Amino acid sequence: MIPAHDPGPASGLAETLPAIPASAGALIFDRAGRLLILKPTYKPGWTIPGGVMEADGETPWAACRREVREECGLDVRQARLACVDFRPPRPGKPGGLRFLFDCGAFPDDELAAIVVQPEEISAYQLVPVRAALDLLRKPIRRRVKAAWRARGTCYLENGRPVPGVTQ
């Protein structure tokens, strides 16, 4: 219900709204359909390019582009939203929203020029999607698998499709 009179920011409404952390990731392919995956230095397993949105009001799309540029030097110019995943809070973890963008196939010369950020990334590889699913960390694996299967935009909760929401 919308109040008849909006008291404005002094009402304290902003302080009662949830602060939801968010991150954005990128699905980047080569012309053969292989997926770019990265091996982070700060956690086990493989992941995709991406990371946390900045607290200064950065948008999911801007975060995706920034993280890809920082982590592997690629310039993402276009994409489609592949997935939004709501992760509920857990003990020691704030939860939040995870955005996944399908950035399409990059030209071979751009992929050959990848330069990883050595403080964060120790290796990268282009692998068939099915093989990538075996290598990716579990939460990201679910998201990538759902987006790959949907071939369109999907909505997930905790990495799983939601009954009643068309995928």
Placement of each model-derived feature along the sequence:
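Acidic, metal-coordinating catalytic segment for phosphate/diphosphate chemistry
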Residues: 1-25
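Nudix hydrolase/Nudix homology domain
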Residues: 44-46, 118-167
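Unchanged
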Residues: 53-77, 87-139
